[in-house]
Amino acid sequence: MKTVLIIGADFVPSSLPPATRIRFFVSHLPEFGWHPIVLTTKPEFYEGKFDPENEHLLKNDLEVIRVSAFSTRVTRKLGIGDIGMRSLLQHWKAVKRICSSRKIDSILIPVPPSITMVLGRMAYRRFKIPYVIDYIDPWVTNSYKKVPKTERPPKWALANALSRTVEPYALKHVAHLTGVSQGTTDSVIKRYRWLSDKRATEIPYGAEAADFEYLRSNPRRQTVFDTRDGYFHISYVGACIPAMHETVRALFQAISQGLRDSPTLFSRIRLHFIGTSYAANGNAPRDVQRLACEANIGELVDEQPARVSYLESLQLMLDSQVLLLLGSNEKHYTASKVFPCILANRPLLAIFHEASSVIDIMGQTNAGELVTYSDKEGPGLKVGNIKVALERMLRNENALSQSNMDALRQYSTSAMTARLADCLNSITSIG
């Protein structure tokens, strides 16, 4: 069995997307002849909340090595909170120690935190071990250029300059790129002439049914809303960045029109936006609430910027009448949460760019109501379509999801990990 060292500053018990993606991979890599070693950070150095129960989702025999990080009590004075930056030195020391004493066949680095990708090139220079960078989110992005300066993150200009300087260095000797969508890796390849699409593979998050099986056996009590209060609860769980605000505005305009045309029906709606901020402490502006007030539906919308744990987010999905998925002004944006939304077996409303892979996934699985927009016809021109979809769901509130779970098998986390194993095999000249 070959060995892959997976470097991820965020890992279980963290509930952040990179931690979940790594967990999905390591749960299935042994099925395909790969022994994973996870190199990560000690939980006490995480800035955000974490959930110890997430550890029940790990395999008992998983090998995990944890290192320290610089405390935010010190680094925040320098404007640094990113766990990747705070643990970079400690991770590099551990990489040198592991690669000097163990036979490591390949290295996998999921990003974000994106600065961690430099460890791939550093390890390659020292040990000649081929490395793969796995893009969950792009590091270099122009998405914030399309939004007003007042809505951009305060340190975006500095972060943008850092990404454009460090990313090409980190990718210079990369053996392979993987990403949650082809659009993500295509944008990277377009920037750097030494990369080729033959060295890139699309690997969506995938659907892990075992997580829902665990939750149904160990249900949690969510405190966001009361399932017995008679309202029609629609939930969106996850970050809502400025690049998504145009879609949010279209949704709110549709509800506003619905309140005008069918007040009795639409007044039952309660929209919940949970975990909308990447800020570790959740002390972020309530942009969604602001947009709701601008549309005069503020009393129907509840925004909680602080992230909830992974298992609590799944419980919210199970308890909601309808689940909501929203696209952004990046046409290839793919919401990884599409898979748990389908597995929750709840009615689903998705509003996405026609080029997003979410369109294919929902089409193949027959997973709910889908409203698409394009470069020529943005979300603002689809308000009527959104209103019609909402009205249909409100009038059939007891309808069950008709998702094709058999079609979802091609997107299982095991199937996605098989793609990763093929990549690792190709760069180590086996299989």
Segments (PLM) and residue ranges:
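Membrane-proximal helix-turn-helix segments that form the acceptor-binding/catalytic region
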Residues: 115-118, 122-126, 156-179
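Acceptor-binding helix/loop patch of EC 2.4 sugar-transfer enzymes
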Residues: 9, 71-81, 98-102, 129-164
